[in-house]
Regions:
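Eukaryote-biased RCC1-like beta-propeller repeat architecture
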Residues: 2-492
Length: 492
């Protein structure tokens, strides 16, 4: 019988058991690197796997990469290109995959908090441990605090009639949408265009209301454009509602829709993995790396080489011709950005103020590789009006475009300067950024430790910093989260 009082070393465990532990938990690439550097058990080669893996930690990283939802969808040539771009190190491949995943969803901080940040026109929404807080200004209800609370100087709790936890949020000019852990979707804000999806309710909705038209259709993602909304179901189907003047709903016509309708074009084309809503156009990424665009062709935002509107989703062929597998996109007001499976970035649309990052202000009629970032691995792209942010896999941030009240984060630049090529934000170099979002004139970032930094205009309290009117340098926002006065969530 085994001696229960005897202590065991981890090195006495069978290698296959240790490997199972490493790959069945929630370890990130940094965890594997720490184990490898601190214990010889994880540094050594123990005959459990081919010699091409120098350590158990490296083999565990490979196994985690194989199972990752992004990596498993890549064709073999794209997998190899990513591996080569990561210097032949599986832990770095894993870091890239996990960083891409975090940057567009929930960030798990080192302190154990779960966070997501998103910015609207003059407001900011924050998920903090499954609860939503908002700050800023909105007369149309986008803050979610009722008709008597149209401005919040600090992050204030938004209440929901559902007990389910919030897992995803999107903010636009004048409305917001929330996805719950249950798959339910809630919206609030200006519904004069029916973008909130509640039928013929042409009024502002000041507190989150459940979108009943999506009952029985669990969703995982939402994207809010200017007066329209896009929903992505867990099964990978796309639904849209709201203004459809330019065909941005992708339904083959220009009729507005008061409730979400399925975009049938995607049926049979494989699962959709990401949606992005611009001012009057929509981008959709499928699991095979194809990017579809529809809506207003103004400023070449659709990426088809012309400015024609598209009423149906249309694949951007320049990506297909070059076998570029896109994993994430961002829809700005006048331009768009894409991130491919090897961390390369492409921009197109209106080049005013250098928002495309090519060193000039020229427009790009179709996606163009951003060569100045080719030596980096980007994990998030974020576009808004005349500016673009690029989050790199080491946690640093690059930006280009119009300074716009300091919203690019370069304190040595004037508030109306133009930055025509991506430059690293030295002001954030001492922090590892996990997610970034930019509004009209303000920007907010979350670090891997759960710190929040904001910069740009704060005239309407959109930074949640009541003592500042604005700041050129990223400034930490100390959360003083509270309940807004007289907030009572409206029952659906």
């Amino acid at each position: 019988m085994a001696d229960r009082n005897r202590s065991f070393s981890i090195e006495e465990l069978p290698s296959h058991l240790i490997l199972d532990i490493l790959t069945s938990g929630c370890l990130c690439a940094a965890d594997l690197a720490s184990l490898e550097s601190s214990c010889r058990m994880f540094r050594g080669c123990h005959g459990l796997y081919p010699l091409k893996y120098p350590s158990m930690a490296e083999f565990a990283a490979f196994e985690l990469c194989k199972a990752h939802s992004i990596f498993s969808c890549l064709p073999p040539n794209a997998q190899k290109e990513l591996f080569d771009r990561c210097g032949g190190i599986w832990k770095r491949v894993l870091r890239f995959l996990q960083s891409v995943e975090r940057s567009c969803g929930i960030v798990e901080t080192s302190a154990g908090n779960q966070m997501q940040i998103t910015t609207g026109r003059y407001h900011t929404l924050l998920i903090h441990d499954s609860e939503v807080y908002s700050c800023g200004s909105s007369i149309c209800g986008a803050l979610g605090h009722g008709p008597d609370n149209t401005r919040c100087d600090n992050f204030s709790l938004v209440k929901f009639p559902s007990l389910s936890r919030v897992v995803h949020v999107s903010a636009s000019h004048n409305h917001a949408a929330f996805v719950m852990q249950s798959g339910e979707v809630f919206t609030c804000g200006d519904n004069s265009s029916f973008c909130c999806g509640h039928g013929e309710v042409g009024r502002a909705i000041f507190r989150p209301m459940r979108v009943e038209a999506l009952a029985g259709i669990p969703c995982k993602q939402v994207a809010t454009g200017l007066s329209f909304t896009v929903f992505l179901s867990r099964e990978g189907h796309v639904y849209t509602c709201g203004t459809n003047t330019h065909g941005q709903l992708g339904l083959g016509d220009t009729l507005d829709r008061p409730t979400p309708k399925i975009v049938e074009h995607f049926e049979g084309l494989g699962s959709v993995v990401q949606i992005a809503a611009g001012a009057s156009y929509t981008l959709v990424v499928s699991s095979d790396g194809t990017v579809y665009s529809f809506g207003s062709g103004t400023n070449f935002c659709l990426g088809h080489g012309d400015q024609h509107n598209e009423l149906h989703p249309r694949a951007i062929l320049s990506f297909k011709r070059k076998n570029i597998h896109v994993v994430r996109v961002s829809s700005g007001d006048e331009h768009a950005v894409a991130l491919d499976s090897s961390g390369l970035v492409y921009t197109w649309g209106k080049g005013y103020c250098g928002a495309l990052g090519h060193g000039d202000e020229n427009d790009k009629t179709s996606p163009a590789l951003l060569t100045s970032l080719s030596s980096y691995l980007a994990v998030q792209v974020c576009a808004r009006k005349r500016k673009t942010f690029f989050l790199l896999d080491d946690g640093s941030v690059c930006a280009c475009g119009w300074m716009g009240f300091g919203s690019l984060g370069f304190p040595d630049r004037g508030t109306s300067d133009k930055v025509t090529k991506p430059q690293i934000l030295d002001s954030l170099k001492t922090h590892h950024i996990s997610q970034i979002s930019t509004g009209l004139y303000h920007t907010v970032a979350v670090t891997n430790k759960g710190l929040i930094f904001g910069f740009g205009d704060n005239e309407r309290a959109q930074l949640g910093h009541e003592s500042l009117r604005g700041c050129l340098k990223p400034t930490e926002i100390v959360l003083q989260m509270r309940e807004a006065t007289a907030v009572e969530a409206e029952s659906a």
